[in-house]
Amino acid sequence: MKNNTVDFVSFSYYMSVAESTDPNPERGEGNIMGGVVNPELEVSEWGWAIDPEGLRYALNSMWDRWHKPLFIVENGLGAVDKLVDDASAPYGKTVHDRYRIDYMNDHLVQVEEAIKDEIPVMGYTSWGCIDLISASTAEIRKRYGFIYVDLNSDGSGSLQRYRKDSFDWYKNVIATNGESLKR
């Protein structure tokens, strides 16, 4: 690192990981990074711990270690989204993904708290803006985007795109520079 320093540190954050001294701890299927189930945290339907405060902790920890500006390049919630009819939505359909809005709101509030801790956060990008096929599972059942793509894992579907409720929510967060976040 001495000869090839970096200008900033970028990282992805989806969940925290807990450890235990118990020789036979409960391990959840969502703990892809190892670790054990944290009974204090909610988990997504994929078993990933939902830990917004863990993001603030990670930001503080990385700053303390490297003293480089930080860039969150991936953060989001994968879920099985249900497309529903909604006459008020463009194209007459949407996904009411309050769970994604809550996840992102709570994580962005913690980014704001880290900034108040004087952590230099360069930026934040969500994962992802549009539903896509998973590189690890080659399926689209688990969706992250603000835009729903009518595509199934077997390849069927019209490929029509629909804005989810989170699309307009995130658009408003950007337009208000975070003032619309619920604290």
What are these regions (language model features)?
Residues 1-183:
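Non-catalytic scaffold segments within catalytic domains of secreted glycoside hydrolases
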